[in-house]
């Protein structure tokens, strides 16, 4: 069993598991932190960004000044943002049989894999994962395509040039694998390969293994996966949460008795408590608005935004914010808000019961009805007419490199009355803000990450007790900034095995058994013999029939009677005739009694030596060697067949035939 690690990002994993003749890809996350190295794409022409000076090498060579621009001491690539893809050279991705998706954040690289690697298999995911994943991809494509950029920068990617660049460009990894965004045509083609599944649904893969999605408690439709055969079990835990938010709670019981547990997608902010972060978010938002400022919340169109809107729904009136407009701007804003209300079966129990009252499971429906929350596809059109300040704007992209958020950063960045509040943990907020410096607006960092922290995961591992744990190397040691915090790492026994990008891990786990069915008529013909009290054995002569990884023992064909004349050969004639087999032997040879038997039969000068696997009996006079081991006995003599047969018969006296 082998695990191929194709991604270096622990919360955006992409691994390939080879297990029992099947090749299974576990998630295909897309690392978007690479976009932080690029200049933002403004919706409206930005004189500030257009007039940034080009960057030149120290020797004065200016051939890079069209590709690289400098802003407040940072250097950025002036080109369409590119994304860091999973490894494509470590394994032939056309051999992947299936892809298992755990949540909508972990499927963003799907079009790159299904459309450009020769992949012909099936993708499995829950319906909310597919629908919300489609929205995220559609928004991403829309953000990139609506601001076309004429030039494409590639000179800086040359290894000899890259090492001369300042950080972080100099330290950027795998820049040769970075790619532009896919198209909607590729998105639709990739999503057409997905087969929808439900929680606890068992899916057979070629008769070899069975995969089952379990609720992970992190997002609508998010899943952990069980991959098992008749005698082995692998659990894949990715993006899980024990907090009571809007999704169904995590299914922990089904993870028990795993031979291997692959652990990914833990919280990116282990020291931040989500509840206190939400409290800080609300209080900072209220403070800014009361002082006449605007609040900008860079966000994804699904996920945490549902919980934030629910908290604000409860907070608005008590904080005196009922007259303040809330705007949600995204090409998929309307679809996202509607989807959240119709996936009732995937919600936690409290929200499911509201559906039958009838009452919308999320309160943002009421915010929309009362005009406190308005949603728009972009800043153009209706939004321009309805826009009034002070206000709160939820919009993407959290990287601040594309989307409507770029316009608001340019619009509000010069005033200290305004505040940008970062709630998504995927991007360093300091790096996200770098191309907007100098910045007068206030910046608040309230990362809300509900995924498992190290204390929770260590407790979980003690409860489910897998034989082996495998995880990214980032989880096996504290971060360099907090090297003294030994509690910020996975604690389990035996210690977890770690992996990194482009590494192949041989899992410490060997398959020992295979299930074989036996036909009833063959079972009737067996004659068991008791070899020990309570233990019986029977020999089986049969034909092993294997199809779709299912093995069946069938009765052997009866010997055909020879007939005169020539006959056309039939397909059944290819089956070999049943041969009369020699009896099998069982038992053990007690050395002391065997030596006594040899002496009784005239052998002398006998010497016994112990070995690691058994004993060696030397008949020095006859120049003969008898090796007695647990599973075999060898008689070695020099071309004396009579002596060999005589010794063989003495050995057989100690063994049972059946």
Swiss-Prot record:
Keywords: Cytoplasm, Isopeptide bond, Nucleus, Ubl conjugation. There is a cross-link at residue 58 (Glycyl lysine isopeptide (Lys-Gly) (interchain with G-Cter in SUMO2)). InterPro entries: Beta_Casp, Integrator_9su, IntS9-like_C, Metallo-B-lactamas, RibonucZ/Hydroxyglut_hydro. A motif (Nuclear localization signal) lies at residues 566-570. Residues 548-573 are annotated as: Disordered. The keyword DNA-binding does not apply. GO terms for biological process: RNA polymerase II transcription initiation surveillance; snRNA 3'-end processing. It comes from the Eukaryota. It is found in: Nucleus; Cytoplasm. Signal peptide: none annotated. One of its GO terms (cellular component) is cytoplasm. Gene3D superfamilies: 3.40.50.10890, Ribonuclease Z/Hydroxyacylglutathione hydrolase-like. Component of the integrator complex, a multiprotein complex that terminates RNA polymerase II (Pol II) transcription in the promoter-proximal region of genes. Component of the Integrator complex, composed of core subunits INTS1, INTS2, INTS3, INTS4, INTS5, INTS6, INTS7, INTS8, INTS9/RC74, INTS10, INTS11/CPSF3L, INTS12, INTS13, INTS14 and INTS15. The core complex associates with protein phosphatase 2A subunits PPP2CA and PPP2R1A, to form the Integrator-PP2A (INTAC) complex. INTS9 is part of the RNA endonuclease subcomplex, composed of INTS4, INTS9, INTS11 and inositol hexakisphosphate (InsP6). Interacts with WDR73; interaction is required for the assembly of the RNA endonuclease subcomplex in the cytoplasm. Although strongly related to RNA-specific endonuclease proteins, it lacks the HXHXDH motif that binds zinc and participates in the catalytic center. Its function as endonuclease is therefore unsure. Belongs to the metallo-beta-lactamase superfamily. RNA-metabolizing metallo-beta-lactamase-like family. INTS9 subfamily. This is Integrator complex subunit 9. It comes from Bos taurus. The gene is INTS9.
